């Protein structure tokens, strides 16, 4: 992961939040458990979405345990409340993948996700040519389409930067 990009991104998020932590899957999992916040992040903790019937234990969640979701994890907090969890990956030299983005359940629909994505895009313009996402359910697909992302294939959407 591009360290300069991550440092810039964390600095930008820091203007909006009390604390921004970046690190590993283990660090995110530990903080979610420590603050007893797992119930507010069902996709990341339990692999559960509105379109799925999955409900695994946090120790089995591929997001927090599997190698497919290695990358840089970022967590935004206000006081002791986690606001969002984000996983970013490099996909080659010019593509950023937003591997996972989950907003605290009761804060969804208030524009927070759009603001987070806008910050990611504005910082990413300096380092990447495009952003790729692979939404996990239809709500996420609709969100990314509203954010201007276009279907690249059957499972991922992309947005060109610097056009």
Q: Model-found features: residue ranges?
A:
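Short amphipathic alpha-helix that is part of the acyltransferase structural core
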Residues: 1-65
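A short helix-loop-beta-strand connector motif used in the catalytic cores of GNAT acetyltransferases and
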Residues: 62-74, 97
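GNAT/GCN5-related N-acetyltransferase fold signature
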Residues: 76, 88-89, 103
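Glycine-rich phosphate/pyrophosphate-binding loop shared by adenosine-nucleotide-utilizing enzymes
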Residues: 79-85, 96
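Conserved acetyl-CoA binding element of GNAT-fold acetyltransferases
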Residues: 94-105
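Conserved acetyl-CoA-binding loop-helix of GNAT-fold acetyltransferases
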Residues: 103, 109-122
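Conserved GNAT acetyl-CoA-binding A-motif
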Residues: 124-136
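Conserved catalytic-core motifs of GNAT/GCN5-like acyltransferases
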Residues: 134, 145, 150-163
């Amino acid at each position: 992961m591009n360290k300069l990009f991550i440092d810039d991104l964390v600095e930008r998020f820091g203007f909006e939040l009390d604390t921004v932590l970046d690190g590993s899957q283990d660090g995110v999992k530990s903080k979610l458990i420590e603050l007893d916040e797992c119930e507010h992040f069902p996709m990341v903790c339990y692999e559960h979405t509105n379109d799925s019937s999955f409900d695994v234990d946090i120790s089995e969640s591929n997001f927090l345990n599997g190698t497919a979701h290695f990358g840089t994890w970022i967590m935004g907090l206000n006081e002791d409340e986690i606001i969002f969890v984000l996983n970013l990956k490099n996909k080659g030299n010019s593509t950023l993948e937003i591997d996972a983005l989950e907003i605290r359940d009761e804060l969804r629909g208030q524009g927070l996700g759009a603001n987070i994505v806008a910050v990611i895009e504005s910082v990413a313009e300096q380092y990447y040519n495009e952003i790729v996402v692979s939404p996990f359910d239809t709500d996420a697909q609709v969100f990314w389409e509203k954010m201007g992302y276009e279907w690249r294939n059957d499972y991922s959407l992309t947005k060109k930067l610097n056009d």
